[in-house]
Amino acid sequence: MAAEAGGGEPLVKFVKLSGRAAGSKKKVRWFPVRRLFTHSCPSLRIPSRFLREGRRSPPARSGHRCVADNTNLYVFGGYNPDYDESGGPENEDYPLFRELWRYHFATGMWHQMGTDGHMPRELASMSLVLHGHNLLVFGGTGIPFGESNGNDVYVCNVKYKRWSKLNCRGKKPNRIYGQAMAIIHGFLYVFGGTTGYIYSTDLHRLDLSTREWIQLKPNNPPCDLPEERYRHEIAHDGQRIYVLGGGTSWTAYSLEKIHAYNFETNTWEDIPTKPYGNLGFPAARRCHSCVQIKNEVFICGGYNGLVILGDLWKLDLQTFQWTKLPALMPEPAYFHCAAVTPAGCMYIHGGVVNIQQNKRTGSLFKIWLVVPSLLELCWENLLKYFPHLCQLPTHQLLQLGLSQELIERLK
């Protein structure tokens, strides 16, 4: 059997603590994102499968991916076997979603983006990264899982709303899904994944300047390689790639010891991590989310083979110390997606929230992982009390004293 592939509150601010002991931790709070929606733009001439009228927010889904910049959250692909939730007869790609959505932070509105070009058809458990104004998509699977996998790189320029397939040479990875991917020093690294039947521990690298793939051959003996896996996540510090969790259809891997690929020595290393007091280590998991801010990595949710997890943990890549943050997902989920803005605000969307009922969600949540800067605090309050700013012309915004950078966030 093939492996599964799809699986207006105030900002945090200083408050008077009621008799809390010194050293106690302020509770981290989740905020449901404002649900204000717009209809998709009718003037774009694109195939109906790319843009379904009447959809004001992304339907519930799993196995999708998302990325974020200062202005938008981009959500691509996904899977939902529920015929009605997936759009019924309007969705030509049922049970998949061949669509790209963006959530505009300044207005709190969802837009289904009309795009030209060749959008990928492998829409579950693909990899997605943001590189400048470009979305890079690799791998993924169609339906049935494992029967129509991909190993091409697709690029969507979000400024011009156009898809293209990257012509690459060299030894491409196998047709896989559930792999992890990151851009480091101008190279696109891909690790692990599954064909649906066989799990991988391969590490590939694409030179984005020459567009040549190579398979890296670490110096370790075969017994010292990481276990084969899918639906793991990776982080990096410029010197090593760190593999976080993942597993197979029947197991989930521990986070007590982390596999790390050393660029300089071309070897895999095992790095023990430090427990968080009496709480110890995060539970083993797969199908979780992971975001990174400098040398801090945050993992959230996932599935350990028994229950859906809703916890939030931080790993310091300098000390390898785990810290459990005092926040729980309002809807514990796996096969969800998460992304963090440059300012340090994490957004989480979708996922499987009930195993017995095979239920998915379309909810969107945000949480600040760092103390927001004064600029960000002022900006959010400005948008809260003057929501009409997005409707003003640029020259008027400049007259009001807004910087060009902030004006760009309104568009």
From Swiss-Prot:
Pathway: Protein modification; protein ubiquitination. One of its GO terms (biological process) is rescue of stalled ribosome. Kelch repeats lie at residues 72-133, 135-186, 187-239, 240-288, 296-342, 345-388. Coiled coil: none annotated. SUPFAM superfamilies: Kelch motif. Keywords: Kelch repeat, Repeat, Ubl conjugation pathway. The keyword Amino-acid biosynthesis does not apply. InterPro entries: Kelch-typ_b-propeller, Kelch_1, KLHDC10. The keyword Transferase does not apply. Substrate-recognition component of a Cul2-RING (CRL2) E3 ubiquitin-protein ligase complex of the DesCEND (destruction via C-end degrons) pathway, which recognizes a C-degron located at the extreme C terminus of target proteins, leading to their ubiquitination and degradation. The C-degron recognized by the DesCEND pathway is usually a motif of less than ten residues and can be present in full-length proteins, truncated proteins or proteolytically cleaved forms. Belongs to the KLHDC10 family. Component of a CRL2 E3 ubiquitin-protein ligase complex, also named ECS (Elongin BC-CUL2/5-SOCS-box protein) complex, composed of CUL2, Elongin BC (ELOB and ELOC), RBX1 and substrate-specific adapter KLHDC10. This is Kelch domain-containing protein 10. It comes from Xenopus tropicalis (Western clawed frog).
